[in-house]
């Protein structure tokens, strides 16, 4: 699903690589943590996957496509294969929960009836079916994050990227969020969780890639998840 082949990224007006010789593969349906301190290169790696940046050297493949070779008009189609969950939720305050979840599907060719069925299914999945007509300001942080998950999944993505998904919610809600993402992975969807919360990573014992100063310093399989490097 994701392939980085000896990828280096150097930004303009910088002599220091943001990423250097990054090489890894993520299978379809795999659940992977990406960890590292601020400045380790996590954000740059995500930008390469999303094709917001291009590699200086090497190749980035997403779902079999070389992102650097994609024509600009094809980039939106690549991104529609992804569901993004942001730390700050990014819900539209003037839309209800239902409307927020349905929003991304309106730009596709999905019919109104199918959208309704899909949104209702997603809200049941995240246990928010009774909040469909509520506006974001009346939701707790954990509820807003679950709406963000439902929205990310609504258009049936092949890849879900969660960027610090527990950063703005309490520890109990963080555990619920990770359990929800595990259920997403069990649906055959590739899940990449970017986080700096090492205790959470150890608890869920999944494959963990650790970045430090732009390089991968460890890539630990799930069965040995407790050995995460900091």
Residue ranges of model-derived segments:
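A short, proline-enriched helix->beta-strand linker immediately N-terminal to the Walker B motif
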Residues: 154-158
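Catalytic Walker B motif of ABC-type/P-loop ATPase nucleotide-binding domains
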Residues: 160-163
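Conserved ABC ATPase signature
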Residues: 135-139, 143-145
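Conserved ABC transporter NBD signature motif
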Residues: 58-66
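Helix-to-loop junction immediately C-terminal to a conserved catalytic motif
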Residues: 50
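A short, flexible loop at the N-terminus of ABC-type nucleotide-binding domains that lies
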Residues: 1, 9-21, 71
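Short coil-to-helix segment of the ABC ATPase nucleotide-binding domain corresponding to the Q-loop/switch region
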Residues: 95-103
């Amino acid at each position: 699903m994701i392939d980085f082949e000896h990828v280096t990224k150097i930004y303009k007006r910088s002599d220091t690589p943001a990423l250097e010789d990054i090489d890894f593969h993520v299978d379809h349906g795999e659940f992977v943590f990406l960890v590292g301190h601020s400045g380790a290169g996590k954000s740059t790696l995500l930008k390469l996957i999303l094709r917001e940046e291009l590699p200086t050297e090497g190749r980035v493949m997403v779902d079999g496509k070389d992102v650097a070779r994609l024509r600009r008009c094809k980039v939106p189609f690549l991104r529609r294969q992804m569901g993004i969950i942001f730390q700050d939720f990014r819900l539209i305050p003037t839309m209800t929960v239902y409307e927020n979840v349905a929003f991304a599907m309106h730009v596709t060719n999905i019919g109104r009836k199918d959208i309704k069925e899909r949104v209702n299914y997603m809200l049941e999945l995240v246990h928010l079916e009774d909040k469909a007509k509520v506006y974001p300001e009346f939701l707790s942080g954990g509820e807003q994050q679950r709406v963000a998950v439902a929205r990310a999944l609504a258009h049936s993505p092949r890849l879900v990227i969660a960027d610090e998904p527990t950063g703005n919610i309490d520890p109990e809600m963080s555990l619920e969020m990770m359990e929800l993402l595990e259920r997403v992975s069990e649906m055959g969807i590739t899940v990449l969780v970017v986080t700096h919360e090492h205790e959470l990573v150890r608890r869920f014992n999944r494959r963990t890639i650790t970045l430090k100063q732009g390089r991968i310093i460890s890539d630990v399989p799930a069965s040995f998840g407790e050995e995460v490097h900091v």
